[in-house]
């Protein structure tokens, strides 16, 4: 299982638009093979930062979603709402036992 964290820095006046598109992105991801869960997080220290944490069964599942046409279309709409390119970090879930 893997977790993907995508950190986005939004433009000041674009928060509502970004949140709407992130909801659309998650609604589309739910239908993807291997998708487990996702949530959006707002930084307490910097109001311009919105991060999305998603969990996938495998790296292959994430990569298939990452290169999908559906995701690309939504990311293209999100891009102008940001001050910089999103930072994507991928983590392997470690055994905790």
What would you call each of these model-derived segments?
Residues 1-2, 17, 33-35, 45:
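Short, flexible segments with low predicted structural confidence
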Residues 2, 39-46, 76-97:
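Glycine-rich beta-strand-turn "strand-cap" elements at beta-sheet edges
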Residues 2-8, 39-66:
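Short, well-ordered beta-strand segments in beta-rich or mixed alpha/beta enzyme
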Residues 9-18:
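Short, surface-exposed ligand-recognition loops at beta-strand->loop->(often short) alpha-helix junctions
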Residues 19, 23, 70:
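Conserved GNAT-fold acetyl-CoA-binding loop/helix
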Residues 22, 26, 75:
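Short amphipathic alpha-helical/adjacent loop interface patches that line ligand
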Residues 30-37, 55-89:
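An amphipathic, aromatic/His-enriched active-site/gating alpha helix that lines ligand/cofactor pockets
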């Amino acid at each position: 299982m893997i977790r993907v964290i995508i950190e986005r820095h939004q433009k000041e006046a674009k928060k509502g638009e970004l949140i709407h598109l992130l909801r659309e992105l998650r609604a589309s991801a739910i239908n993807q093979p291997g998708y487990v869960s996702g949530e959006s997080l707002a930084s307490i220290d910097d109001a311009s930062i919105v991060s999305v944490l998603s969990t996938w069964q495998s790296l292959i599942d994430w990569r298939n979603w990452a290169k999908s046409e559906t995701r690309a279309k939504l990311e293209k709409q999100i891009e102008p709402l940001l001050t910089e390119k999103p930072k994507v970090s991928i983590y392997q879930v470690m055994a905790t036992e």
